């Protein structure tokens, strides 16, 4: 796991690579090329995990010297790619060497063969093309700027300030407050984009004018139709889960496991222990004792003791909440509305004191219907089938109810367009709320922005959604949108800030393809989620852990916001950039009434993170 950087037709600035040194403290490299009239630079910061010798240093050349790569990530199946190659003279055993030689012989369409997490750039000198690609679920981020025949790309945003003026985009900021994150390809900056999950960008350098083409290298899977005898499916699920964890134990350095009080990380830890020849440490974060009815650390401790694994925990209270949040937001570089980012910072710091690599249980809730909100999809299924029910719902008056999850369900339920319904189902701010918050033309301006963003979302997904049924497509979209651009994004940034690689076994290609092929009844009922997941988990874990009530990661956010209310208001309302976009009086109303709004805390954190980013 590393940091990558590159540019075309810019003079390379060494300080830009230094700005991501935390992603790769074990080494660095820069290579310059001349392709026709274009000046190309590939740069790299290295975190040594597989083949820690100099044979793994980057940028790395293919055996014949034609292709060069700068690579961030892991290819877990790289050994299975070697028999498909003519090249055999490997200097080491790194997946980077496999990758650069594989694509020196194969086409970029063969990206679908890679099972791993990655963001990389490959320069093919013979073809005069630069390829920049991101893994299919977006575990590893890549940002880029392409304008006026110039390109910059990087694992993080901070290098861009060495090359371009960074201008905030009002519409993208508004979108963040609507959806709680800014989804790829957009960022809060006008000219900086994110490569989308499962996307490859090709820059053709054969002519004076660089030509960019974008394509998705993964076809939409067949989803939600597979049915057969339950026991055989549980067995197959278990085999794929075990295979996924075993693959991701690939490392020449010590590996640990992030352990919460939930089933997902517990199952990953249990299988990892079973498959690993080396002892594993587990890591947990929690808050001061007595703060919540349930204690994350105590629950994780029970799991670790059951599995006979060492557990290292840290308790935090974030007394200096604002100062800590300033550090966190500068690391993450994007606006955030998820309070769990705050304890994740402490967990990342703790983990770095012991290991370079950790496995996490992230990625289960979306494909396996683990979130409470997915129960509502069962009702939406009936509304889609019987249109008169949707018409009747419009007459109920539910729209006027103050409970936010009811409002979101209503907005989605009465919407006949599935992609529009998806956005409403996942929003943290209604159109009316945004209309009040935006300055200048208010509601009319908001309506224009939201319609434009909705149109772009449809353009992105219309041809790729697997079904017009919400119960199939909503989890599919969550996995490739909110998971990639929110949870996975900030986990990568925080872990890599402390030079730790975080792996996600549940997002293994083969495992997800199997999960998504299943009929939803194997995953969700009115009373249960993750059904097949829990059935397999019973082979490794006691029922008390498998069926422990899902509580999510609780944070004392309400206490933080009360304690620091005036300081938060001062930070947000004194921001000149915030004042250009939002109505300050409306922001003060959000701050004063957040306890009556189910999404009030998310809105405050989003606005606060924006203000801190814009300082």
Predicted regions and their residues:
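In a subset of proteins, long, contiguous C-terminal domains/tails are tracked
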Residues: 1, 529, 583-615
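Cysteine-centered catalytic environments shared across enzyme families
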Residues: 1-332, 344, 348, 538-539, ...
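ATP-dependent adenylate-handling active sites, centered on carboxylate activation for C-N bond formation
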Residues: 8-11, 126-133, 139-151, 220-451, ...
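Structural motif
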Residues: 36-38, 88-94, 167-168, 232, ...
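Short amphipathic alpha-helical segments and their helix-coil junctions
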Residues: 81-85, 453-470, 516, 580-597
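A Lys/Arg-rich helix-loop hairpin that forms a DNA/phosphate-binding surface
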Residues: 90-91, 502-507, 578-580
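Phosphate/pyrophosphate-binding loops and the adjoining catalytic core of nucleotide-dependent enzymes
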Residues: 483
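PAPS-dependent sulfotransferase catalytic core
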Residues: 541-597
């Amino acid at each position: 796991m590393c940091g990558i950087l590159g540019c075309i037709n810019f003079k390379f600035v060494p300080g830009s690579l230094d700005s991501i040194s935390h992603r790769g403290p074990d080494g660095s490299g820069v290579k310059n090329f001349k392709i026709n009239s274009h000046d190309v630079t590939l740069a790299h910061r290295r975190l040594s995990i597989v083949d820690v010798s100099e044979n793994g240093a980057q940028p790395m050349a293919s055996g014949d010297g034609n292709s060069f790569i700068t690579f961030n990530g892991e290819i877990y199946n790289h050994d299975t790619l070697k028999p498909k190659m003519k090249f055999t003279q490997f200097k080491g055993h790194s997946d980077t060497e496999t990758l650069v030689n594989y694509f020196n012989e194969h086409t970029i369409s063969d990206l679908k063969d890679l099972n791993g997490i990655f963001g990389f750039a490959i320069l093919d000198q013979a073809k005069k093309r630069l390829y920049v690609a991101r893994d299919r679920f977006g575990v590893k981020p890549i940002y880029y700027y392409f304008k006026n025949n110039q390109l910059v790309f990087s694992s993080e945003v901070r290098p861009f300030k060495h090359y371009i003026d960074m201008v905030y985009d009002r519409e993208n900021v508004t979108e963040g407050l609507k959806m709680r994150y800014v989804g790829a390809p957009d960022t809060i900056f006008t000219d900086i984009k994110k490569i989308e999950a499962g996307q490859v960008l090709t820059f053709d350098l054969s002519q004076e004018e660089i030509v960019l083409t974008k394509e998705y290298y993964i076809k939409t899977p067949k989803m939600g139709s597979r049915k057969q005898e339950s026991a055989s499916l549980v067995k197959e699920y278990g085999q794929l889960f075990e295979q996924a964890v075993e693959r991701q134990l690939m490392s020449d350095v010590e590996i640990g496991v992030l352990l919460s009080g939930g089933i997902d990380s517990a199952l990953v830890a249990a299988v990892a222990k079973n498959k690993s020849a080396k002892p594993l440490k587990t890591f947990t974060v929690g808050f001061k004792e007595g703060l919540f009815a349930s204690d994350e650390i105590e629950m994780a401790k029970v799991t670790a003791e059951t599995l006979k694994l060492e557990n290292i925990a840290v308790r935090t209270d974030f007394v200096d909440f604002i100062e800590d949040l300033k550090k966190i937001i500068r690391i993450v570089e994007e606006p955030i509305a998820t309070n769990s980012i705050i304890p994740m910072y402490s967990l990342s710091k703790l983990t770095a004191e012991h290991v370079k690599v950790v496995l996490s249980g992230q990625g289960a809730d979306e494909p396996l219907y683990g979130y409470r909100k997915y129960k509502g999809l069962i009702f939406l299924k009936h509304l889609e089938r019987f249109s008169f029910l949707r018409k009747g719902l419009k007459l109920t008056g539910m729209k006027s109810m103050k409970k936010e999850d009811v409002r979101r369900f209503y907005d989605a339920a009465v919407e006949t367009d599935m992609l529009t319904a998806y956005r409403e189902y996942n929003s943290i701010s209604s159109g009316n709320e945004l209309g009040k918050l935006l300055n200048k033309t208010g509601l009319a301006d908001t309506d224009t922005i939201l319609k434009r963003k909705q149109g772009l979302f449809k353009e992105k997904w219309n041809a790729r959604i697997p079904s017009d049924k919400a119960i199939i497509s909503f989890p599919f979209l969550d996995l490739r949108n909110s998971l990639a651009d929110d949870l996975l994004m900030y986990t990568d940034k925080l872990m890599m800030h402390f030079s730790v690689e975080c792996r996600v076994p549940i997002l293994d290609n083969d495992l997800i393809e199997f999960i998504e092929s299943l009929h939803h009844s194997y995953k969700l009922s009115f009373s249960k989620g993750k059904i097949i997941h829990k059935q397999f988990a019973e082979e490794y874990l006691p029922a008390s852990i498998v069926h422990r009530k899902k509580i999510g990661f609780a944070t004392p956010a309400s206490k933080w916001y009360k304690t620091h209310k005036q300081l938060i208001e001062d930070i947000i309302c004194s921001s000149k950039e915030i004042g250009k976009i939002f109505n300050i009086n409306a922001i003060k109303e959000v701050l004063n009434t957040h306890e009556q709004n189910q999404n009030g805390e998310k809105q405050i954190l989003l606005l606060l993170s924006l203000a801190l980013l814009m300082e």
